[in-house]
């Protein structure tokens, strides 16, 4: 079964969200949106952009966000690979940028250096972060477990997210 069919099935079954990469062919995005409309918008959709090689400069990140926003979706997701701690600051800087444009965003970094962005993103106004259920089931490098995230938020005194 191809990803298009899996996304359509997710919509039919009432998934809360589906995630589609910004580089997906327009006609496939159109098919997915039609499926969402057919099911009365029960499912919301995320337009995502992943950069596995690194984190571009601020201006390039903002252009990427704007391009994803033009595609549509309920949430824009920008994920890059952090090679240095400063990369986290650039990606997290998209959160106020998105807020100023009236858009919901998920902005975080992958990799060992990106772990802090996964914790900080929701605290700074991102829609959410991602965590694995247990060690060894991570969907991206640097992803913490749900238990680790809960412990960090408890230690920070922010409560569970």
PLM feature spans:
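Short, small-residue-biased leader/transition segments that mark boundaries at the very start
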Residues: 1-3
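Active-site loop-to-helix "anion-binding N-cap" substructures in soluble metabolic enzymes
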Residues: 8-12
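Short, well-ordered alpha-helix to beta-strand connector turns
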Residues: 14-15, 73
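Catalytic alpha/beta core domains of metabolic enzymes, predominantly
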Residues: 22-161
């Amino acid at each position: 079964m191809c990803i298009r069919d899996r996304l359509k099935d997710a919509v039919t079954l009432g998934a809360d969200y589906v995630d589609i990469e910004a580089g997906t062919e327009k006609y496939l995005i159109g098919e997915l949106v039609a499926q969402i409309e057919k099911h009365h918008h029960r499912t919301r959709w995320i337009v995502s952009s992943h950069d596995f090689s690194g984190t571009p400069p601020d201006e390039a990140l903002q252009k990427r966000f704007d391009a994803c926003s033009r595609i549509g979706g309920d949430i824009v997701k920008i994920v890059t690979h952090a090679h240095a701690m400063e990369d986290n600051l650039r990606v997290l800087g998209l959160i106020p940028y998105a807020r100023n444009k009236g858009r919901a965003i998920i902005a975080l970094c992958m990799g060992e250096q990106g772990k802090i962005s996964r914790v900080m993103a929701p605290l700074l106004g991102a829609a959410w972060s991602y965590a694995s259920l247990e060690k060894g089931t991570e969907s991206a490098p640097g992803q913490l477990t749900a238990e680790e995230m809960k412990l960090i938020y408890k230690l920070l005194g922010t409560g569970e997210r």
